[in-house]
A protein has these predicted regions:
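Outer-membrane pore/translocation modules
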Residues: 58-83, 167-179, 210-336, 412
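N-terminal periplasmic/intermembrane-space "pro-region" immediately following the signal or transit peptide
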Residues: 2-84, 375, 462
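Short, intrinsically disordered/low-complexity patches at protein termini
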Residues: 72, 181-183, 192-193, 226-230, ...
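Glycine/serine-rich loop-strand microenvironments at binding/catalytic pocket rims
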Residues: 99-131, 192-260, 323-358, 362, ...
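Intrinsically disordered, low-complexity regions of eukaryotic proteins
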Residues: 20, 25, 30, 36, ...
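Short, surface-exposed, polar/charged, turn-prone segments marking secondary-structure boundaries
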Residues: 77-82, 123, 185-190, 233-235, ...
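Outer-membrane beta-barrel pore domains
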Residues: 20-21, 26, 42, 62-63, ...
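Outer membrane beta-barrel
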Residues: 38-65, 86-222, 262-266, 272-279, ...
């Protein structure tokens, strides 16, 4: 009888041949050659989108202290004779702070682009009530390998656009920020960053950027309202603000429009790391520095106050801080340690800003505990982990001299902030963080005051 068997190398054609013995014993059939599915092309163009939202319950302690500035009567609420620094929005509040759209594109391992678009942006807005509610937080393209990826030999990269400072802590374990992170590297800058890796341990990085303007904000969740159109006495007599000034510190604010005229900020970093990045077992140290010339003024969205020298000079250039020149310099060192579920981040900074000195340091310890599988939903574990976190930060301005009537004496205060909290995974892509900020400020007369805050954050990602 006839049987049909594939022929090896026959291009998929079958050959018919007589096999008389097949009726008795069966015929051996040559095995078919299995087609191996090709793997994904590592050089293919890929695009990925993501989304994140954050909802909160915030409870802020009430604190009200007199401002030494002689506000004109028309700029004060009806019947008031004195201006005050006051908690931005005391009491308990439910609020949606941000909706974020992410977009990532890559073309092989050496070309990558990233965009991060924020909507609402409540906790980044400054002033809180009048700043823009949409922000292009990051927008950059990188040529060369990922600087965080392990490299056996020499490698270089260049990144251009709007991106975070290279020394910034990008894996913060709370929703809040420490004093040092708030003051020096919370917000992105825009320009050019170049880096080089030398084997697996040593790397260099440098940047040439626009430079974040100097402004002030409260270190708690809400930045506060200072210089808003609603509080402008030339537009509204005796305004009654819904949000208050807060207790602002000087900080590097968000860059607004692209401006590369004049002096740019230069940054340098020298790093040393051990262990494989992303493996959970890594130690990394980075020494870094920035310097630039401050502008006479910088226009900022939502406020009639100017940034840089204009802010430091005070109203009418008569009630300023003790500034000399326009140099702005920072020198710092950062340490990251990862060991399994344990992580540590530390940062120390010395700053000279228009002849005034300021130092600060902070350290954050977190430990993630993976929980055993007890419940699941939709094939995903419920309550997969717990992560307690503690952070201590300290900021010491040395701004002696100048006018005692500068409107925000809080920029001169010695400040300590202890943040402690717990992050709990609810299900993949959803977590809950409960944290408490214990603020202690030392006033000019040596007395101490507090401006504490409880913050609960429900974060969802997809």
């Amino acid at each position: 009888m006839l049987s049909v068997a594939p022929t090896v190398g026959g291009g998929g054609r079958a050959a018919a041949q007589e096999t008389p013995a097949a009726d008795a014993a069966g015929a051996e059939v040559a095995p078919a050659t299995e087609a191996v599915a090709p793997g994904p092309d590592p050089n293919a163009f890929r695009v990925h989108f993501g989304f994140e939202g954050k909802a909160h319950y915030r409870d802020s302690e009430q604190l009200r202290l007199p401002s030494p500035f002689p506000f004109p009567p028309e700029s004060l609420p009806p019947g008031a004779t004195q201006g005050f620094l006051e908690s931005v929005n005391e009491g308990g509040h439910f609020e949606l702070s941000v909706l974020t759209l992410f977009a990532d594109a890559s073309w092989g391992p050496n070309i990558e682009a990233h965009a991060k678009l924020d909507f609402i942006d409540l906790y980044d807005r400054n002033p809180t009530s009048s700043d823009k509610q949409f922000d292009v937080d990051e927008l950059w393209i990188r040529f060369g390998g990922d600087p965080a990826a392990p490299v056996d030999g020499f490698g270089m990269y260049a990144r251009v656009g709007k991106f975070g400072h290279f020394e910034r802590q990008n894996d913060r374990h709370t929703e809040s920020y420490g004093l040092v992170s708030t003051a020096f590297n919370r917000f992105e800058d825009q320009g050019l960053e170049i880096g080089a890796n030398f084997g697996g341990h040593f790397y260099l990085v440098g940047s040439l950027t626009q430079g974040n303007p100097v402004f002030f904000r409260d270190p708690n969740a809400l930045a506060g309202d200072n210089g808003t159109p609603e509080n402008d006495p030339s537009l509204h007599d005796h305004p009654v603000p819904e949000l208050q000034s807060g207790f602002p510190i000087l900080y590097d604010a968000e860059v607004e429009d692209l401006d590369v005229d004049g002096d740019l900020e230069t940054g340098y970093g020298l790093g040393l790391r051990f262990g494989e990045p992303g493996s959970g077992h890594e130690v990394s140290f980075l020494a870094w520095a920035y310097q630039r010339k401050m502008a006479e003024t910088v226009a900022l969205n939502g406020t009639f106050y100017g940034g840089d020298i204009d802010l430091l000079n005070g109203p009418q250039n008569l009630f300023g801080l003790p500034i000399h020149g326009n140099d702005k310099k920072e020198v710092g060192g950062n340490l990251w340690i990862y060991q399994g579920g344990f992580s540590f981040f530390g940062q120390y900074v010395q700053q000279e800003i228009a002849g005034m000195d300021r130092t600060g340091y902070e350290g954050e310890v977190a430990w993630r505990f993976d929980l055993p599988l007890a419940w699941a939903a939709g094939g995903r574990q419920l309550f997969p982990y717990l992560q307690p976190v503690v952070r201590y930060s300290f900021l010491k301005p040395e701004f002696a001299g100048g006018s005692p009537r500068f409107p925000a004496p809080s920029v001169r205060w010695e400040w300590t902030k202890l943040d402690y909290g717990l992050r709990m995974g609810i299900i993949e892509g959803v977590d809950l963080t409960i944290e408490f900020a214990d603020n202690e400020m030392t006033l000019a007369n040596g007395s101490k005051v507090s401006n504490d805050e409880l913050l609960t954050t429900l974060r969802f990602r997809m």
